[in-house]
Amino acid sequence: MCDWKGRDNCPAPARKTSCVSRAALHSNVRWKWCEKSTLDRASNCWRGT
């Protein structure tokens, strides 16, 4: 699953209802962006290895 790391780690205000694995600045690190709900004003970012 995804681990909460704070929205500050989010490189872009992407809105996604499900976790999507994408390459971050570090190719060795996999990032996952998630959002609790579209109604949430703050973008929730999640990080996964």
UniProtKB/Swiss-Prot annotation:
Completely overlaps LDB7. This is Putative uncharacterized protein YBL006W-A.
